Amino acid sequence: MNYIIKFLNKLNNLTVAIIILLAIALASALGTVIEQNKNTDFYLKNYPLTKPLFNFVTSDLILKFGLDHVYTSWWFIFLIILLLLSLTLCTITRQLPALKLARLWQFYTNFNTKAKFQIRFKTNSSSLTKLTYYLEEKNYKIKHFNHFVYAYKGIFGRVSPIIVHFSLVIVLIGSMLSTTQGRTQEAFIVVNQEKPVLDTYEAYVNDFKIAYNSQGLIDQFYSDLILETRQASKIQKTIYVNEPLNYSNITIYQTDWNIDNLVICIDNQNYYSIPLQFIELPNGSESKYWINRLDLFGQSVFCVVNDLTGIVYLYNQNKDLICISSLGEFITLNGHTITFNKLVASTGLQFKLDSFIPLVYLGFLLLMISTLLSYISYSQVWLVKNGSTTYIFGSTNRAKFAFIKQLTEIANQC
């Protein structure tokens, strides 16, 4: 039991809390730099032992310490729990007692206590009533006791640190639950087809389009979606990168795209849907190519497509270019007419079901509220009457010069 108490006392320390927070920030940075939730071969290929990232991050380190899934690793969750405990202990043992003390009426019945205060005045006025009236005009709460007066205002300024801690606790709990309990699914859905997702929804793709810039490079890609629930409610939206679909607790992100099939017509009679295979080029090239080998009329040809503009390249077995064709254009091969009719595309989507996002939003809302409350000054004034002289003592947690100016005005009016 003593060990637990000592451990909790260690956690109830600002320095320890900052160290834990820095450790979480470092882990989060690694989780941002290192691709998450990829297969083992990906890390072996991209983080070789011979060329470590930052001179120390290798595939062995990533796989051994769970850096391939940082946010769901046991040690990251443990750091979150430690920070939660530290914030909770600080709130209970420091912030709440400070608030309780602030709410108590604090009387100083001896003018000799003036040494306690950096802000102090004296006036020849013997009327506490007049001074009290001026304080009330400045929205102070007043408490009388014989020849002594205690006044305060801005108690909400003392509440803001507690709300900060409380909001951070909510954000951390919401983020942890979101990471461990939320569900994510990635899928490619062909245009004009639907697919069940996350056991509860059906996603249907009406259309998929790509916008190109003046240099012929991809500028943006769009998916026109219909999301249907088991309750038969539907929502439709055209999404694109950085503009997801949000419905209830599900969010759908536009992530990728693919070309699945090439529809061809031979001799204006027979239609065939030819599957295309994506080819990843070496040296990290960003260009995309889809290819298929066809045996047409005793001749092997390669159909190559690199976008949805409708341009098809035909190569022979020697990798020599035979011709370049567009969709709907007729070409002749060994006496037969061939038409490339259609490219069948699919859109790459990420579906994220998370019931705890509202909890995270609530935490950030409270954090913003606490930031506004922190600008409220908590000010206290003591009036101590001694014969024909009245002493004015003051204390504030911020805006000290404005507070001094206010007390000076009150003293001068008397």
Curated annotation (Swiss-Prot):
Keyword Nucleus: no
Pfam families xrefs: ResB
Signal peptide per UniProt: none
Gene Ontology, cellular component aspect: chloroplast thylakoid membrane
Main subcellular location of this protein, as a coarse class: plastid
Cellular localisation: Plastid, Chloroplast thylakoid membrane
InterPro entries in the record: Cyt_c_bgen_Ccs1/CcsB/ResB, ResB-like_domain
A single BP term in Gene Ontology: cytochrome complex assembly
Residues that span the membrane, as ranges: 14-34, 73-93, 159-179
Entry membrane topology: Multi-pass membrane protein
Record keywords: Chloroplast, Cytochrome c-type biogenesis, Membrane, Plastid, Thylakoid, Transmembrane, Transmembrane helix
Family: Belongs to the Ccs1/CcsB family.
Subunit structure: May interact with CcsA.
Role according to the record: Required during biogenesis of c-type cytochromes (cytochrome c6 and cytochrome f) at the step of heme attachment.
Name used for this protein in its record: Cytochrome c biogenesis protein Ccs1
Classification lineage: Eukaryota, Cryptophyceae, Pyrenomonadales, Geminigeraceae, Guillardia
